[in-house]
Amino acid sequence: MGFTVAIVGRPNVGKSTLFNRLVGRKLALVDDLPGVTRDRRIHDAKLYDLKFQVIDTAGLEEAANDSLEARMRAQTEAAIQEADVILFVVDAKNGLTPTDSTFAEVVRRSGKPVVLVANKAEARGAQSGMYDAFQLGLGEPCPISAEHGQGMPDLRDAIVELLGEERVFADEKEEETADEVFTPKAVGELIGDDIEDPDEEEIPAYDATKPLRIAIVGRPNAGKSTLINTMLGEDRLLTGPEAGITRDSISVDWEWRGRKIKLFDTAGLRRKSRVQEKLEKLSVADGLRAIRFAEVVIIVLDATIPFEKQDLQIADLIIREGRAPIIAFNKWDLIEDRQMVLADLYEKTARLLPQVRGLRAVPISGERGQGIDKLMENVVKTHEIWNRRVSTGRLNRWLAGVIAHQPPPAVSGRRLKVKYMTQVKTRPPGFVVSCSRPDAMPQSYVRYLINGLRETFDMPGVPIRLSLRTSDNPFAGRAKKKK
């Protein structure tokens, strides 16, 4: 086994469930009662093509030095020292606790590469807990469901990105040399005074060879299954004139221009008032889960009756979930005056969905196979933008120019001070601005900053998250201490 992974976190966040998932057997006891795991357990594990040793640990808790809990914590800290990479697990369903923040600092001080794992991401309301996890300063959360096995491809990719392919695929004979040359990096943690030379910050290039997950969504009978069948070149999915044929969220493997793609066909999404039968409610919930675990979401609109209220609600849901959206105007073969209609559709797209200015929209005919390549070219471009990262140095030089040109307005006679900006995540791009009195910052100025980011750094058509914080730079002074 080439490397070691330690699973750590507070009690009852799902560490043992994840351990069982990775080893492929129920070796660790799992229960809703916190504190079931006491000793650290080590076992051979596999995650797709990755082979490694995984350590299950007791939940980290504050405890007196001579208590059982303190000895359990010592076991966990020993596991941290043994590990090459740490999976720090939080409960996205129930959100963060002060204990999470306390032990995130313990993990950070270890200096080991850390994957922040947001478990129970399939639960209703988990998105809020996942966003809260950014404040731990451990980088972008990786949403998973250890119980249901969802999000495992992203977890695999996160481990490879941190350790590097040479390290994770090294033979056992190469382990010692791999350990010597490895230097952990966490670009998402670099903010403020912690950066000595922003221009040297490395931004990884977009990997166009990685498998891509695409969900196909829309109102009933918009032509979603027909589109997928045309892509595949076979009648893989049941289609017909009756609305609502698709019930399950079906995933199929496909390859486009040498790139592996997983397509998710979903049940037609109706208004809640029209979703009555239990089976249909389950189908819609399944479709929503497919959206959450997809990367790019193609919104299929019937070009003959586009932009119904339900279409806009679906688009808004996708944007709020932070997915990379793209519109496919289907049934284009039924349109007569195509040039005039297309101009009208582009105008409506910009006017009705201003929160993703520059959203890509492509006319297609799923039945005749027209426009599929152009649609996929735009899918790949949107996915690249969704993964885009901007160096902290470039961001703050841009921010200084923005403030000089258009400073934040004064509120109650006091000028708002903006200190610095950093990008804390991708997928979608997320930024944090440190400023005085964030609650007083007008939303109009926040939108001004978002629009400026979108235009300056070429990020059209994807959601952009921007949060304001008043706390001091948590990494300030660290560089000074190292001297």
Curated annotation (Swiss-Prot):
The gene is der. HAMAP family: GTPase_Der (MF_00195). GO terms for molecular function: GTP binding. This is GTPase Der. One of its GO terms (biological process) is ribosome biogenesis. Residues 388-472 form the KH-like domain. GTPase that plays an essential role in the late steps of ribosome biogenesis. Pfam families: KH_dom-like, MMR_HSR1.
